Amino acid sequence: MLIIETLPLLRQHIRRLRQEGKRIALVPTMGNLHDGHMKLVDEARARADVVVVSIFVNPMQFDRADDLARYPRTLQEDCEKLKKRHVDFVFSPVPSDIYPQGTEGATYVDVPGISTMLEGASRPGHFRGVSTIVSKLFNLVQPDIACFGEKDFQQLALIRKMVADMGYDIEIVGVPIVRAKDGLALSSRNGYLTADQRKIAPGLCKVMNAMAEQLKAKELTTEEIVALAEQELNDKGLRADDIQIRDADTLLELSATSKRAVILVAAWLGQARLIDNKVVELAE
């Protein structure tokens, strides 16, 4: 496994791989890797000749400086995990290589509509930062496929739209959420939880699953389901932040023609903002 830190060296290897006709898979990450990331790597490994994992804590997608500063940087441990998964290249650039003039005046990629709804409404600029760094990585790595986790449901939808709109010839692979035995979705931010908070955290998944059953039963309105979920989260010791039930294919409000719904939940627990989602098939 080769660790690449500079753009010229990355371009040199990508040029060679392209000349050799290799199929390249990209797994973009911000590091602090866990089993959920490893699932992405395994999926990439099964689909391509060469796997490139990027590790870059992207300053453009953080809406708070303190959140950026405390995001865990664990490059050495991450590389050890990736080596065991037979990753070919780790691309770990410094911010000045990605944003030579800083992030304030940098050229950016914005995906209208989807960037400012839902999570985007509560985190201004976040999705613009995501689409910009992913676009940069696509241009640098030139992958045939790229793997993203379904835990970040809106992010995956945003990337699919960006790829379609920009004409990228890249297959986007969504990989199912990896959960702990108690149902908590794996996340780098789970590391912010204390031992006591970790015991409370699975309540988010339990409330979400209850919402799914209520939605299938069709006995309550979506507004009633959301209100009950907010109360239940608060009763369990979490602080409800944003709970939505949307059309899974458009992320718009549910309509009579919606075939699938997605439940999107976000709640605070101590210093950690936990998110999760669940897709529900709607009966005819």
UniProtKB/Swiss-Prot annotation:
- Residue positions annotated to bind beta-alanine are 61
ATP-binding found in the keyword field: yes
Query: SUPFAM superfamilies, alphabetically?
Result: Nucleotidylyl transferase
Pfam families xref list: Pantoate_ligase
Per UniProt, where does (R)-pantoate bind? Answer: 61, 155
Tagged with keyword Nuclease: no
Q: What is its EC number?
A: 6.3.2.1
Q: Which GO terms describe its cellular component?
A: cytosol
> Which positions are catalytic residues?
37 (proton donor)
Quick one: where is this thing mainly located?
cytoplasm
Q: Could you list this entry's UniProt keywords, alphabetically sorted.
A: ATP-binding, Cytoplasm, Ligase, Nucleotide-binding, Pantothenate biosynthesis
Source organism superkingdom: Bacteria
Q: In which pathway does it act?
A: Cofactor biosynthesis; (R)-pantothenate biosynthesis; (R)-pantothenate from (R)-pantoate and beta-alanine: step 1/1
Catalysed reaction equations from the record: (R)-pantoate + beta-alanine + ATP = (R)-pantothenate + AMP + diphosphate + H(+)
Localization of this protein: Cytoplasm
What is a GO molecular function of this protein? ATP binding
Query: Can you cite a GO biological process for this protein?
Result: pantothenate biosynthetic process
This molecule's function is given as: Catalyzes the condensation of pantoate with beta-alanine in an ATP-dependent reaction via a pantoyl-adenylate intermediate.
Give any extra note attached to this record.
The reaction proceeds by a bi uni uni bi ping pong mechanism.
* NCBIfam families, per the entry: panC
The family note in this entry says: Belongs to the pantothenate synthetase family.
Q: How does it assemble?
A: Homodimer.
This one is known as Pantothenate synthetase
Q: Which organism is it from?
A: Enterobacter sp. (strain 638)
- Gene responsible for this protein: panC
